[in-house]
Amino acid sequence: MLDKKKFYINGEWVNPKNPNNFEVINPSTEEVCAVINLGSSDDTNSAVKAAKKAFETWKETSKEERLKLLEKLLTIYKARWDDMTDAITTELGCPKDWCSANQTSSGAGHIEDFIKRLQDFNFEPGFDKGSVNHIVYEPIGVCGLITPWNWPINQIALKVIPAFATGCTMILKPSEIAPLSGMLFAEMIHEAGFPAGVFNLVNGDGPGVGTDLSGHPDVDMVSFTGSTRAGKLITKNAADTIKRVCLELGGKGGNIVFADSYP
């Protein structure tokens, strides 16, 4: 049984401020495979504080600096492919070969795709030739990222990597019933050398850490994938602080992307 009670905050693995153990079950064996801690408001506040402080310098990094870190992260991810497969297989109870070919590969694929997109992305595009006007794309700020259990590293990569790429800092709350892949990803991020506070991880449940993140005045955006019920609660809780809310709820709200969406 794995002891995974610590959180990743401000570049360090730290003990929870208010211990609240939670057993993670391997569905294939129906046995306890790990013990994590469900975070408290104090833990969330520490992570948000670290992310807010780190944002002041991270937002000023160049595209080239961020690309270098993402490319290093991709190298580490591929080197630890089997570790990621083992983590997901344990938390989901899925067949190992299928997990490697589908779950683990999705994480690497998303990192590769966002690296390519960042390489070509213009953060200050102009309008018509000769126009003095132009658009400046700026990072949103501190992002609260809440991911589901069923495609853990897929959803984590889809939220974390574009946040990195655009100069945002973040707090990740992976699903408490499938937290192992997210914690392993945090190890990879640390090894890649991302500055302290840019990425933080606090385990917890929706009513606890999820509520704290969605209502926190220093969180500028919440991205959530999960149930419609939880999405409604997050939207309501976020309203008082007028933060951006991005929801993918049980297949609701599908997007149609046309061929001319990007130049």
What is the meaning of each model-derived region?
Residues 1-131:
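N-terminal Rossmann-like NAD(P)+-binding subdomain of aldehyde/semialdehyde dehydrogenases
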Residues 123-263:
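Rossmann-like NAD(P) dinucleotide-binding subdomain of oxidoreductase/dehydrogenase enzymes
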